[in-house]
UniProtKB/Swiss-Prot annotation:
It comes from Synechococcus sp. (strain WH7803). It is found in: Cellular thylakoid membrane. This is Photosystem II reaction center Psb28 protein. Part of the photosystem II complex. Keywords: Membrane, Photosynthesis, Photosystem II, Thylakoid. HAMAP family: PSII_Psb28. It is a peripheral membrane protein.
C-alpha cells in the first residue's frame, strides 16, 4: 500500500490484491457481534505464478491493519477459482473500526454500498447514507 490515505486487502503481506471482493455483513440483533464475508472470484492470490501459502487476509489502512485467518479456497474441476474470507468482530468498537476500513477501501476502489434485496432476518446490510 503506497499512499497513507488508501486502504488495501492483502493475502501476502506487502502485496495488494487487485480483485475487488463481494462483501456481505451480518450482525447480531444487539449489534455487538457480527461478520463480514469477503468473496474474491479469480483473485491474483490464486494465480499459478503466485508463490507461497495464504496464511490470512490483511485489511490495511492508515490506522493499521485488521487480520483474519479464516480464509478458504474454492475449487472447480480441481482448479482454484475463488477465495472466501470471514472477518468476525465481537465489540461495537471492532465493528466501527471495520466500517472505517470499509469506507476507506470503498473510496480507494471507487465503490459504494447497496442494500441486499433478499430477506436476511436478523442481518444488517451496509447502506448508503
Amino acid at each position: 500500500m503506497a499512499d497513507g490515505d488508501k486502504a488495501a486487502i492483502q493475502f501476502f503481506r506487502g502485496t495488494d490484491e487487485p480483485v475487488v471482493p463481494d462483501i456481505r455483513l451480518t450482525r447480531s440483533r444487539d449489534g455487538r457481534t457480527g461478520q463480514a464475508t469477503f468473496i474474491f472470484e479469480q483473485p491474483e492470490a490464486l494465480a499459478p505464478e503466485t508463490l507461497g501459502n495464504i496464511a490470512g487476509m490483511w485489511m490495511v489502512d492508515e490506522e493499521g491493519e485488521l487480520v483474519t485467518r479464516e480464509v478458504n479456497g474454492k475449487f472447480v474441476n480441481g482448479k482454484p477459482s475463488a477465495l472466501e474470507a470471514t472477518y468476525t468482530w465481537k465489540t461495537e468498537q471492532d465493528f466501527e473500526r471495520f466500517m472505517r476500513f470499509a469506507e476507506r477501501y470503498a473510496e480507494t476502489k471507487g465503490l459504494g454500498y447497496s442494500n441486499n434485496s433478499g430477506n436476511n432476518e436478523g442481518a444488517d446490510e451496509a447502506s448508503e447514507g
